[in-house]
UniProtKB/Swiss-Prot annotation:
Pfam family, one: Thi4
Organism: Methanothrix thermoacetophila (strain DSM 6194 / JCM 14653 / NBRC 101360 / PT)
Pathway: Cofactor biosynthesis; thiamine diphosphate biosynthesis
Gene name tied to this protein: thi4
UniProt family annotation: Belongs to the THI4 family.
Any single biological process term in GO: thiamine diphosphate biosynthetic process
Binding site for glycine: 234
UniProt protein name: Thiamine thiazole synthase
Keyword Metal-binding: yes
Function text: Involved in the biosynthesis of the thiazole moiety of thiamine. Catalyzes the conversion of NAD and glycine to adenosine diphosphate 5-(2-hydroxyethyl)-4-methylthiazole-2-carboxylate (ADT), an adenylated thiazole intermediate, using free sulfide as a source of sulfur.
GO terms assigned for molecular function: iron ion binding; pentosyltransferase activity
InterPro entries in UniProt: FAD/NAD-bd_sf (IPR036188), Thi4_fam (IPR002922), Thi4_prok (IPR022828)
Cofactor: Fe(2+)
Amino acid sequence: MALDEVKITRAIVESYLESFLKCTDVDVALVGAGPANLVAAKRLAEADVRVVLFEKRLSVGGGLWGGGMMFPRIVVQKEACRILDEYDIWYREFEEGYYVADSIEVVAKLTAGAIDAGAELINLVSVEDVMIREGDRIVGLVINWTAADMAGIHVDPLAIRARVVIDGTGHDAAVCRVVQKKIPGAIVGESGVIGEKPMWAALGEKIVVDATREVYPGLIVAGMAATTVAAGPRMGPIFGGMLLSGEKAASIALEKLAQSVD
């Protein structure tokens, strides 16, 4: 068979647009494809929720790839090992309570898990604003190509509708900061987006899970973004809290969706 370059082009464009159009009206839109949101996306998709996950970079995985200081290993505490088991991720006990996993395997399998469950992942797309309705409730996202932002060119964005948004943008807490900046009087969380504190692994791992919650009508925060909003300390290359945070964020989102139906 002779290959036709134009057919290759059409196959890519038509199939992508078909998928993209399905993502313009979803139940849950997740921003930032780090470990917390990858776990959340899988949980939500398994519950037959329409899910799209936007990542501004070329690659997904957030800070997982580099492990600790470019050593591709991460540490997970015992209570989160069950999530690694769910994805068939290999790990070993280093010392009591400290389990080590290959960071690249973790990224690959978390990503595959979300996709296999039915979540749609879209990379190279940035979220620059939110969409609101009565009472300034968040009802969607305003998106644009990351390349347009990097090039500094003015291109009007597009919008997608979502019943719930999850900010998993890491240290930036980007969606939360947009809400705080652009909605008069908006208070994200208890005191607004304060920013993270210096490292304290034990406390940071607790706070990242405790701080995973709805912080503004229609907006849930997960992972390091939750820590940033709650002014918790960073925790470094231990990722159990991130995985548990994603699990909790999905559970909260499902509760919110059920309430909106009622």
